[in-house]
Amino acid sequence: MDPLGLPFEMYNHAGLFRTTEFDKPVDTTGEIIDSGDPNLDGPVENAIDMIGKLAESERVEQVFIRHAFRFWMGRNETLNDAPVLQAAHKAYRENNGSMKALITSLVTSNAFVYRTVND
């Protein structure tokens, strides 16, 4: 399994917590590598540790905002979308990680309201 998958071995196929499998301890150690954020990269003890590191990362937050943009706009972002992404990130942050604030920021932006049609 990959270094990001091993931490989730602490849960079985049904999502139940476990410490052993066939009477042997489950290895839940993993590693975040090549994330683009040196503070994020490194070993993790288990899924909880990994989730904590991801939750504290501004880079992960920015990736989340970018993926929300792609979903709601139905397209990939361009350089011209930087102000929309920055405003969405600001709304998300200022509202304590509110998905509602993020979506509202995106769907009220000019990029969403004034779409162009390609022939």
Predicted regions and their residues:
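Active-site substrate-binding loop specific to GH73 endo-beta-N-acetylglucosaminidase modules
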Residues: 1-59, 65-69, 82-94, 104-119
